Amino acid sequence: MKKLPIGIQTFSELIEDQHYYVDKTPLIAELAATGKYYFLARPRRFGKSLLISTLKSAFSGEQALFDGLYLQDHWDWLVRYPVIHISFGRGIVTSDVVLGQRFRAMLDEVAESYAIVLLQQDLANRFAELIQRLHQTNQQKVVVLVDEYDKPILDNIENPELAIAIREGLRNIYSVIKDSDPHIKFAFLTGVSKFSKVSLFSGLNNLRDISLNPRYASLCGYTDKEIKAVFNGHLDGVDFSLLAEWYNGYNFLGEKVYNPFDVLLYLDQRLFKNYWFETGSPSFLIKRVRERQYLIPDFENMVIDEVMLSSFDVEEIALENLLFQTGYLTIDRVEELGGERFYYLTYPNREVKASLNSYLLRDLTHSSASVVTSHQMQLYKALSQADFARLEQSLVLLFAAIPNDWYRKNQLANYEGYYASIIYSCFAALGLKVIAEDATNQGRIDLTVLLDNKVFIIEFKVLDGAKKQG
């Protein structure tokens, strides 16, 4: 039986060490045959690095690795292209100077592997020199692959001045790709975020963005069909409805996909856990929610237009865009009005909804994880037993536990939405189905909570502190 490729990001290692591989090479063949410059944005831990590594092996002519895969009979293995593989995934870039040092080291590593000595000292010129020399010495055009193209910026997103300086350095680097067009066979850039072309790719305006192209929706991630076809040796006893509820649901305008990191760890451990969520901290996102005073129930009703979808930048980061790009929200549906497309966002699955709301709840209440969990357990027990006296008492205790200073600092504390956000996050973090602003023929319900075969309707009212009853 083959091994689960947990944490494997190198295609050659995956194949040679007998790991499972979900064959994405039909899409790779199509990309190579129909275009030249590509960009793909996907959330972290979604298989982007493995995709880049697979492209590198294909263009390098490593035919033996593709035995039994689609590409074996749909690729010209007689031609080997020189490949420049750049990855900013290792370590943190702490300044524009470090960015230059890191990039120079990667260029020199590639040059050394092809026995080339670079003479240019300026980084952009050195990059251009490497591309030209590789073309000349190998008599084949060059393939440029850039992984985690945006990580140096995202690592410093809370320091706008530094992030902008790093962005300018990257723009100078990426502009070389367009200027080197006569020497380039294929270029592919991946990252988490989609920075606007004006800010980062002004010199590379021929980049084809396939992030929301339905044809390539499953280029990264696993479809339900792929899981059942490839991992059949590890599927005994798997409840596919629960697997989908927990880890499926990412919609890039094609077939919905699972997060591969979640699937592999679940198949290994057979426990439904927040595997993907625990690999990163949403601290910057939580900070933005707090600063902008967003209401948490509104997260499932966010609407974003195409302009906002492509306007992610250091100076202007819309929360809707941030939630989508980082994988905490996904596309629920698309609506066209007056020739414009509008994207309705929602949580992709139970893991993300429960985990994110758990973080949000701790921030909303300014309480520790243990305190919040204790209150959640009491509320859950009260709901499951339909014990309304206990439910009321549990709610009173939950709000009483919030520090007074936190109330005074929070501008939303005088509004119903603040309390609705706390209760929404409390139940959503438990994995319950919670519907905010549920529309009925009698009006709108503030909050609807579904548990087993019970439906709980909750309304919120904030009374004037001077009034004793209302």
Identify the meaning behind each predicted range.
Residues 388-470:
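Structural signature of nuclease core domains in nucleic-acid processing machines
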Residues 1-415, 430, 452:
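Phosphate-binding site recognition
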